């Protein structure tokens, strides 16, 4: 059934498999985890896919769903703790970097 929404999880590399799912007619979002650089690459990839696809395929690229595999309490504690941002790999750092990126896209 084509009404399935694909969450395309890739944590270690920004694999471009969203294109495969869109070509098959599925709506798809890429789902990064705790690596900010990979997550930002996935945002750029999704924008590129939308801009360089025909309208039929472009509509299937739904965006990004950030994955957090911790409880809300521990995530929020990390998010508001300044020492968290010294880490290169972190759920909280990834969310913060994605929010910064999204703010640059608002006027597009």
Question: Which residues does each predicted region cover?
Answer:
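Substrate-binding groove of N-acetylhexosamine-processing glycoside hydrolases
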Residues: 1-108
């Amino acid at each position: 059934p084509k009404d399935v929404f694909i969450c395309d999880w890739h944590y270690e590399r920004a694999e471009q498999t969203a294109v495969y799912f869109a070509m098959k007619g599925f709506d798809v979002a890429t789902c990064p985890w705790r690596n900010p650089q990979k997550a930002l690459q996935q945002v750029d990839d999704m924008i590129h896919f939308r801009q360089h696809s025909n309208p039929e395929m472009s509509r299937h690229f739904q965006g990004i769903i950030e994955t957090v595999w911790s409880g809300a309490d521990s995530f929020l504690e990390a998010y508001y703790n300044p020492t968290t941002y010294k880490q290169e790999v972190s759920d909280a750092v990834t969310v913060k970097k994605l929010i910064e990126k999204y703010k640059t896209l608002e006027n597009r």
